[in-house]
């Protein structure tokens, strides 16, 4: 996975994957629920963008040199990485930029602390339901665009 596979808050996309002839060690292999983070980029606004990994059956999937993996079993993790609190923290931590490659360090990610309110489970259920609906709508939109493209190609032969 590279930074172009990270879609701020959405699941990691699997378009334009790059394959290398190296076997990652066990800790580097992505697991369902892992957060994939852009740790360095020539474009400062892209540093810190994060997606969550959903296992799609790719054996030994891992991240490229400028990306990092955050792993937690807490069900709020993927939502925390989409919060304003996270984004503000990242903005304070970014090094470089202005022509140099901007970056953050693993310690910057580990230094983030969040207050988790009592009763968060209710909000978590709502967020998960909204996301499920959103992903379904995305799939439908993709199919609609495919039908549109097909019809247009047939119309103007």
Give the residues covered by each predicted segment.
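Sequence-specific dsDNA recognition surfaces
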Residues: 4-35, 57-58
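Short, Lys/Arg- and Gly-enriched loop/turn segments at beta-strand edges
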Residues: 44-52
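Short peripheral tails and domain-boundary helices/loops at the edges of structured domains
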Residues: 56-79
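A short glycine-rich beta-alpha junction/loop motif
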Residues: 58-66, 94-121
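Glycine- and charge-enriched low-complexity intrinsically disordered segments
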Residues: 75-92
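Amphipathic alpha-helical coiled-coil/heptad-repeat segments
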Residues: 115-157
């Amino acid at each position: 996975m590279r930074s172009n596979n990270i879609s701020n808050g959405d699941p990691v996309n699997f378009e334009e994957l790059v394959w290398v002839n190296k076997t990652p060690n066990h800790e580097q292999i992505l697991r369902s629920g892992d957060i994939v983070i852009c740790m360095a980029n020539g474009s400062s606004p892209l540093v810190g963008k994060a997606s969550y990994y959903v296992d799609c059956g790719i054996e030994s999937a891992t991240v490229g040199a400028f990306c990092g993996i955050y792993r937690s079993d807490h069900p709020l993790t993927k939502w925390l990485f989409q919060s304003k609190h996270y984004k503000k923290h990242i903005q304070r931590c970014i090094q470089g930029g202005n022509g140099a490659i901007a970056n953050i360090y693993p310690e910057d990610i580990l230094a983030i602390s969040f207050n988790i309110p009592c009763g968060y489970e209710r909000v978590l259920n709502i967020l998960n339901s909204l996301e499920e609906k959103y992903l379904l709508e995305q799939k439908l939109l993709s199919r609609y665009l495919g039908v549109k493209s097909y019809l247009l190609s047939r119309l103007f032969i």
